[in-house]
C-alpha cells in the first residue's frame, strides 16, 4: 500500500476512535480490557499495526506470530515474506496457511515485542502456522539464550 496523506489521515482517525472507545470503557470499569473481535489463540498469526519505528526496525502492518496472550497485551514475533536467500541466525522460515493457500513466512526473532491488543487489524483474517507453539517457544528461548 502506498503511503499517502489520505491513508495516514484515515489511519489517524481510526486510531483516535479506538482511543475514545477504550478510555470510555476504562472509566466505566477500570478492570475492562480491549477484546478484539477477531478470534485467535496462541500459535496463530494475526495482522498487527506495528506503527512507525526507528530505522532498521519493522514498522507499519505485518503478520505476527502470537506467542503469549497476557490479557490486554500480546507477546508477538513479527514476520515477513520469504525473499531469496537463507534466513539469518535470528530468523526462521515456517509454513503458514491463509484462506486455504499455503505459503512461507519468515519469523524475525530479533523484532520480538509486547504489543497492545488494540494494534490487531480485525479486518484481516488470522493465519494458521504449520509449526507448533512449543517449537516456536523453544526457538525463541534458544535465541534469547535461556
Where are these regions (language model features)?
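C-terminal terminal-subdomain/extension
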Residues: 1-26, 91-146
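Short acidic, S/G/P-rich loop/turn micro-motifs used as interaction or catalytic elements
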Residues: 53
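Compact nucleic-acid interaction/catalytic patches
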Residues: 56-99
